[in-house]
């Protein structure tokens, strides 16, 4: 019997992008269901009753929540194509450290640029320093996993579609400050899995501009 795979998602979510990319890298066919985050479906509330958030990966009726956990699950469940995590225990731990860093540092700081009035400039400066730390880790490698596109790349690349948002509202230039990281992002976008998962930056800017108006930030 064929696997039934459903992804509850939202187009602009960098976390949903992670799961889309991982599934594409593994060539897993799935039913993509776009959620209305302001009118969540009964299926989403049933499958993720704790956080009530997307993305939710449903595999044969069983939910897997949180995007980094989903990447691991996908890698272990469909091991044949394109390994996403290193097999070496140390390299695996190292990759998990940086993915955790991205969630705790990049996401939290970047959100302040567009969602908190009066903190845009300060948060943008902090974000640049965080991205420079990631740029140092990348070094001269093709990907964060050397020659292999994988876990850390997937964890970070979705934020690239939001870079224009951070630049617009934070009044910074990520390309001039972190040119190596932007070059890495362009390499990632050459992969079909990434190109199809990431929305156009202008679409994200329009969405966030509308959200800011509704939140009374503009």
Swiss-Prot record:
Q: Which GO terms describe its biological process?
A: 2,4,6-trinitrotoluene catabolic process; glutathione metabolic process; toxin catabolic process
The record's similarity note reads: Belongs to the GST superfamily. Tau family.
In its UniProt entry, the species of origin is given as: Arabidopsis thaliana (Mouse-ear cress)
* Descriptive protein name: Glutathione S-transferase U24
* Top EC group: transferase
Per the annotation, which location comes first and is thus the protein's main one? cytoplasm
Give the UniProt entry's GO cellular component terms. cytoplasm; cytosol
Q: Kindly list the organism's lineage.
A: Eukaryota, Viridiplantae, Streptophyta, Embryophyta, Tracheophyta
Q: Which CDD domains match?
A: GST_C_Tau (cd03185), GST_N_Tau (cd03058)
Where the record annotates domain GST N-terminal, the positions are: 3-82
